[in-house]
Amino acid sequence: MMGEAIKEQILAVRDTALTNMFDIPAVQKIASDMGYFELVLFLEENRKAYVQFILTGES
């Protein structure tokens, strides 16, 4: 399950406008640079839930 903290971190990375949000390795790099290590790990284990959130805004 995707918690509120993960959602907020995804939105913060998106707001940087530094990458396409479907470029997951780039999202992980930006998240790491921002100190969002929980998001980096989440993306390793929950890519399907992440893509669903990006596409629909729902988790």
What label would you give each PLM region?
Residues M1-A26:
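N-terminal acidic leader/helix
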Residues D23-S59:
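Short, charge-rich amphipathic interface segments used for partner binding and complex assembly
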